[in-house]
From Swiss-Prot:
GO terms for molecular function: ATP binding; iron ion binding; iron-sulfur cluster binding; nitrogenase activity. The gene is anfG. It comes from Rhodospirillum rubrum. GO terms for biological process: nitrogen fixation. It catalyses: N2 + 8 reduced [2Fe-2S]-[ferredoxin] + 16 ATP + 16 H2O = H2 + 8 oxidized [2Fe-2S]-[ferredoxin] + 2 NH4(+) + 16 ADP + 16 phosphate + 6 H(+). InterPro entries: Nase_Fe-Fe_dsu (IPR014278), V/Nase_d_su (IPR004349). Keywords: ATP-binding, Iron, Iron-sulfur, Metal-binding, Nitrogen fixation, Nucleotide-binding, Oxidoreductase. It is an enzyme of class 1 (oxidoreductase). It comes from the Bacteria. It holds the Pfam family AnfG_VnfG. Hexamer of two alpha, two beta, and two delta chains. This is Nitrogenase iron-iron protein delta chain. Its cofactor is iron-sulfur cluster. Its EC number is 1.18.6.1.
Length: 116
């Protein structure tokens, strides 16, 4: 991964960390499912692709994805210069980084507490 990609991921992660409460679910499986749902739909929106709204969960993730995609488009004009494959690669790397920060690399023991 080149430095430009890392810098862009850092900007996108920083926005999520400062503005998106959905990253703070109390269990790891909730966080994993939510990260997947929201970031997949955000990617589809950024790439002007159809978004599946077939379930209540899909609709919930879509609402957060619309807010995130709108914020990204308004704050990071370089997204408009990227082609769909590059956006998908960027968002895939962002997803991996977010999962690490909020799930696998988190020191929050409540994430894995079976009684919580």
């Amino acid at each position: 991964m080149d430095d430009l990609m890392k810098d862009r991921i850092d900007l996108l992660i920083d926005y999520i960390m400062k503005h998106c409460l959905w990253q703070f679910h109390s269990r790891s499986w909730d966080r994993k499912r939510q990260n997947e749902g929201i970031l997949t739909k955000t990617t589809q929106l950024l790439c002007d692709e159809p978004v599946d709204l077939g379930t209540p969960a899909d609709k919930c993730y879509w609402v957060d994805a619309v807010c995130l995609a709108d914020a990204y488009k308004s704050r990071y004009p370089w997204l408009k210069t990227m082609d769909k494959d590059d956006i998908k690669a960027l968002m895939g790397a962002l997803h991996e980084r977010l999962d690490h920060l909020t799930i696998t690399g988190s020191l929050n023991l409540e994430l894995t507490d079976q009684h919580y």
